[in-house]
Amino acid sequence: MATAFAPTKLTATVPLHGSHENRLLLPIRLAPPSSFLGSTRSLSLRRLNHSNATRRSPVVSVQEVVKEKQSTNNTSLLITKEEGLELYEDMILGRSFEDMCAQMYYRGKMFGFVHLYNGQEAVSTGFIKLLTKSDSVVSTYRDHVHALSKGVSARAVMSELFGKVTGCCRGQGGSMHMFSKEHNMLGGFAFIGEGIPVATGAAFSSKYRREVLKQDCDDVTVAFFGDGTCNNGQFFECLNMAALYKLPIIFVVENNLWAIGMSHLRATSDPEIWKKGPAFGMPGVHVDGMDVLKVREVAKEAVTRARRGEGPTLVECETYRFRGHSLADPDELRDAAEKAKYAARDPIAALKKYLIENKLAKEAELKSIEKKIDELVEEAVEFADASPQPGRSQLLENVFADPKGFGIGPDGRYRCEDPKFTEGTAQV
């Protein structure tokens, strides 16, 4: 049965689940351009030998991986019922949470910039639900849903958005800086590209623990960032280092085609970001980011490679945000027809259709999940609203390593609690 979730065509001379050590990978052939940048591009690579003679390597596609899995499982489906319901619940949580954030922002419960993730849920769910708790995720300013997918509670994320002490950063991080040590959510970053070096460092730490300290560590790191980041220096520097040291990291480009108000096609000399992977000696893959099952299959291969010590992968997920850049953006620059085209490809609606048509779930089961998530999000709002504001003295906590430094006076009290502090007459 033909569906929107037909296996994506992704080809490479070095399969995602294979080794490419000591090979120079260069792109040599692209599929013909199409009107939809998100149509699947085949990736063909060549290997150069010492005599500079060009020789074609075997091409392995994701379809072959999918067929092998289907023959092993004696089924034509890519997921089980349990997996499908888990994916659906996570995507519904992300969408419902962000919709509620919009309501709370316009009611004055949130302040500053708030960037929502509506439309991009297939990317977060497709990758993060394959990870373990000890794996790390590094995000951007559009980080609420990444945190939720990684296991941070809706209460903790909503409270952080409300600026309350019960938030995952005790109310000091806000929308763009979700962090949880418990869940290895290593932060959202307000400046584009700033999270990529952090993610590369986390991956280096995993490799060091395994190879130098001889610890039983197969942790991987997933770094999320947008198309607008891919012209920044940190991106290229970290691709180089990750390939050089064969770090267990997956670089995930959430290409939503717009960097604030700048079209991706106007901002870069070559809009096909995935090609930058082979330039540094790692697989580069382009996948339909509106399709959670396609994303998931690619993610499986990339994560497996990283766990086996075979190095990094660059994955370009072409997706689309259904709202403006932030809640302060009236979204007047994007063409209405373009927005309508992508809205018709809603990843949640597509997954719902797939689950029902393949008899993996009934309408009533999915409605039950939606109801449960609505109640969970509403309860998170009530919890956040009732939570206390952080005390002013908290501003100086966790800033200085010396507990008797600037933040705390000789009497053991925080200096900012001294009335003279606010008067500007305190001796510091």
UniProtKB/Swiss-Prot annotation:
Protein EC: 1.2.4.1
FT transit peptide: 1-61
Catalytic activity: N(6)-[(R)-lipoyl]-L-lysyl-[protein] + pyruvate + H(+) = N(6)-[(R)-S(8)-acetyldihydrolipoyl]-L-lysyl-[protein] + CO2
Localisation per UniProt entry: Plastid, Chloroplast
Signal peptide bounds: none
An annotated GO BP: pyruvate decarboxylation to acetyl-CoA
Major location (coarse): plastid
Pfam families with a match to the protein in the record: E1_dh
Cofactor: thiamine diphosphate; Mg(2+)
NCBIfam families: PDH_E1_alph_y
Annotated protein name in UniProt: Pyruvate dehydrogenase E1 component subunit alpha-3, chloroplastic
Species name: Arabidopsis thaliana
Gene coding for it: PDH-E1 ALPHA
